[in-house]
A protein has these predicted regions:
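Glycine-enriched, solvent-exposed interface loops adjoining structured elements
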Residues: 1-132, 137-213
């Protein structure tokens, strides 16, 4: 769901004011008010990304489909392969090859100990169509998603959905999963307080954000 930046700023200010023990910031002098608004706006996308990166899947919205992937599979050995990730890829929602018996929701990183098993010459030791594994790696071409493994190289991509890094669009809107909105406002409030050297209050609001997920 797309939320307008001006409304997000307003809601973050309310969160900050509700957690202050002195004069609410909404009653501050105009120059300070404008500075606060700018500081909040500069932390909105950071707050959205932090929340979306840790939120459980049932709180996330549909996500974005990988675009142009139909002919973009690069095959390796033992029916494993890889695809290039979209430039704005932040988090995988779901990935499934057509001959897999179940999809992958969580990915490994290249420094994960389990990743070494994907280099085994024994296919059963790697991920299989019954127990597939995906790994996010860095290649000369860009970040990629390696998958292990398919039954044959005739397999195609059946599902590929991800959460992108957030951005403010040309109309002043930000795409935020609706069920994560309250957590985002508290996360942004916490980041702003930390930037203003209000460490204890900022840490408290960051914990409030996590508790809502």
């Amino acid at each position: 769901m797309v939320f307008q930046v001006k409304n997000i700023v307003r809601d973050v200010r309310l969160v900050i004011d509700q957690n202050r023990t002195d004069t609410p910031l909404l009653a501050s002098a105009e120059p300070n008010t404008l500075m606060l608004d700018e500081l909040i706006e500069s932390n909105i996308t950071k707050a959205v990304d932090r929340v979306h990166s840790i939120a459980p899947y049932h709180l996330l919205e549909q996500g974005h489909n990988f675009e142009g992937m139909s002919d973009a599979i690069y095959w390796g050995d033992l029916e494993s392969g890889w695809v290039l990730l979209p430039p704005d890829f932040m988090r995988l929602v779901i990935f499934r090859m057509s001959d897999w018996e179940r999809p992958v929701y969580n990915v490994l990183s290249a420094d994960d100990k389990l990743y070494k098993r994907m280099r085994s010459r024994v296919k059963a030791v790697r991920g299989t169509a019954q127990r597939p594994v995906c790994v996010v790696t860095q290649r000369p071409e860009g970040r990629s998603l390696e998958f292990y493994s398919c039954k044959s190289e005739e397999a195609t991509i059946a599902q590929a959905v991800y959460i992108p890094y957030s951005k403010i669009d040309n109309y002043g809107g930000v795409d935020i999963s609706e069920k994560c909105y309250d957590a985002v406002t508290r996360m942004a409030a916490g980041l702003v307080c930390l930037a203003l050297n209000e460490g204890e209050r900022g840490a408290s609001m960051l914990e409030m954000a996590k508790a809502l997920l």
